[in-house]
Swiss-Prot record:
Gene symbol of the encoding locus: acpP
GO biological process, one term: lipid A biosynthetic process
Keywords on record: Cytoplasm, Fatty acid biosynthesis, Fatty acid metabolism, Lipid biosynthesis, Lipid metabolism, Phosphopantetheine, Phosphoprotein
Biological role: Carrier of the growing fatty acid chain in fatty acid biosynthesis.
Modification comment: 4'-phosphopantetheine is transferred from CoA to a specific serine of apo-ACP by AcpS. This modification is essential for activity because fatty acids are bound in thioester linkage to the sulfhydryl of the prosthetic group.
Pathway: Lipid metabolism; fatty acid biosynthesis
Pfam families assigned: PP-binding (PF00550)
Gene Ontology molecular function, alphabetical: acyl binding; acyl carrier activity
Protein name (Swiss-Prot/TrEMBL): Acyl carrier protein
Keyword Lipid metabolism attached: yes
Sequence ranges assigned to domain Carrier in this UniProt record: 4-78
Amino acid sequence: MTEAQIKEKVYDIIVSKMGVNKDQIKPESKFSDDLGADSLDTVELIMELENEFDVQIPDEDAEKISTVQQAIDYIVKK
């Protein structure tokens, strides 16, 4: 899967989990500050990313993922 495909899928997951419009999402968007996620939303988003991309994201790594681009970069590296 290419980085562009991963980005598209991550955006789709954010739209479905957080109820935002795709045009509101930017790579630098912070889940809590810019997209209105609370801590539960963020946990659910991380779990959905794990399921969709078949990766395990340990809690200590998940805590460091606060922007859309950080999520994409993490998945690309795995």
